[in-house]
């Protein structure tokens, strides 16, 4: 089973590291091409393109400028420990054992606008480049055209390496759009998380994102290898709703806390 999750905008390069092991991203040549394009942007252009404040635009212009491809533990950190967002609050990778990191390295992938695909222990330097951003490049008008089949091919390599054909899609639509399902040598299972509000179950963004991290952790901690095992997920009050589920979609619900 291969789990896909999105990256996060919030990055942590300060906290103590819980593992010293690392690998290098497999698509750094592509990342370098995107950095070359991004360096052409002025801070005001970055602000407009990413819809961020002038201050954040300045920070990210500096990140593009400072980025260099010789990654070391001194100038980069493991991706799974850098990202800090709702998904990663649920994942809590900072509490992983070395065995957890081993399993995650084989079975978890983070999709990325800049790096394409990241394994948990891949070093990364700080960046902000969301997949949906329309950054013109030599291959087209946006990052989806830039990455083309590259991300899908890399995922197929990972599936072949583990001798499996199931992808658990816990990524956002923006990021999963970078994957070509028809070219993916896998059955795609999408867990959906619904929270009750005023008597109705619906997707509440913050809770759903955190639940994607909780589900990723559940798979990693329990070393799950078959999609039917996912129905046992019960973290923080969620339960599997078979009646609402289908072959490609597993629905989990949680009652409102009263």
Swiss-Prot record:
One of its GO terms (biological process) is response to hydroperoxide. GO terms for cellular component: cytosol. Pfam families: H2O2_YaaD. HAMAP family: UPF0246. Belongs to the UPF0246 family. This is UPF0246 protein YaaA. It comes from Escherichia coli O1:K1 / APEC. The gene is yaaA.
């Amino acid at each position: 089973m291969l789990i896909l999750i999105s990256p996060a905008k919030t990055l942590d390069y300060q906290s103590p590291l819980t593992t010293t092991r690392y690998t290098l991203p497999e698509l750094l040549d592509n990342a370098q091409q995107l950095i070359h394009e991004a360096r052409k942007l002025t801070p005001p252009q970055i602000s407009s393109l990413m819809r961020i404040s002038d201050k954040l635009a300045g920070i990210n212009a500096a990140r593009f400028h400072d980025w260099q491809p010789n990654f070391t533990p001194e100038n980069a950190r493991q991706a799974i420990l850098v990202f800090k967002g709702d998904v990663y609050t649920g994942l809590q990778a900072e509490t992983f054992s070395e065995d957890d990191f081993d399993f995650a390295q084989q079975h978890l992938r983070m999709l990325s606008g800049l790096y394409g695909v990241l394994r948990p222990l891949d070093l990364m330097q700080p960046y902000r480049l969301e997949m949906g951003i329309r950054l013109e490049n030599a291959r087209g008008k946006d990052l989806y055209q830039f990455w083309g089949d590259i991300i899908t091919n890399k995922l197929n390599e990972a599936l072949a390496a583990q001798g499996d054909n199931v992808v658990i899609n816990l990524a956002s639509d923006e990021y999963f759009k970078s994957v070509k399902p028809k070219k993916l040598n896998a059955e795609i299972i999408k867990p959906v998380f619904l929270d009750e509000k005023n008597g109705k179950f619906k997707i509440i963004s913050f809770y759903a994102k955190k639940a994607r991290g909780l589900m990723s952790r559940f798979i990693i901690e329990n070393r799950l290898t078959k999609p039917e095992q996912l129905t046992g997920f019960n973290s923080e009050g969620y339960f599997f709703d078979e009646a609402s589920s289908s072959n490609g979609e597993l629905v989990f619900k949680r009652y409102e806390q009263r």
